[in-house]
Amino acid sequence: MKASKTGMPKRRNARKSDLTRFINTSLVDLVAKQIRSMIFAGDYLPGEKLVVRELSEVLGVSHTPVKDALNRLVAEELVEAIPNKSMVVKSFTNNELVERLGVRLMCELFYAGEIIRSAKEDDTLVSDLEACLTAMEEAICDDSNIDYEAWVSNETRFHRRYMTAAKNQTLVSVYNGLNTNEFTFFAYLHNEHKPLKRPIFENNLVEHRAIIDALKALDQARFVRAIAWHVLHACEDYNVDEEAQLRIEQIKRLAECHLDGLGEPSQKIS
């Protein structure tokens, strides 16, 4: 094996370089995870500036992994890069959220029949949803140490799991791109300057249980009511102005018309 000028074989130099990249990548992973957790916990609120020097001091690392971690969080849409200025925690507006929730509900309503048919054929759908619900319960079991990130992650998995049952990849891509569970969490954080409260989590668990029970029963109308109520209940937390109120009323009419189409006239979602 040909040696380098220092006497170290070139292959060994290559291995050392590979190891350095691995260590750096692992450190960026850890730093990104820590900053992400601080954002979910409300330590850094939407719109708040993220200063590399301050984060480096808090986390006890150099500037480079912090910069790399922030760029990763930009790609995840948790952080926003302001041209020629700095990086800030991304802000989520109420109207944007209500718009996204409306599109989400439209996707869920119009593919409810396909989801019910899949539940009839695939026993793993309900069991997968049960696993997500259990993980959500575990995330909030300790009042002094609620794992907000785990809650949002598992709630997202819950809804995406039954949408994959519609067997339409284009639909799934659109639905996943809405990212409403994360959007909802951070919109609340933006409004209240603190994470979701326990009563909201507990109500959410009840609503998710209703969705599972409807799928177990293979009852399409019941499933539609459960998903409609879940989305509309989320909307009400952001009913802060006339524009939001009008959009929410449109979403209600959409759900009620869909129930009418299932042969359940005069169904009101309230």
Indicate residue ranges for each PLM-predicted region:
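Short helix-coil transition/hinge motifs at the ends and kinks of transmembrane helices
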Residues: 11-18, 123-124, 141-147, 190-199, ...
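Residue-level recognition of hydrophobic positions within alpha-helical transmembrane segments
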Residues: 64, 100, 104, 151, ...
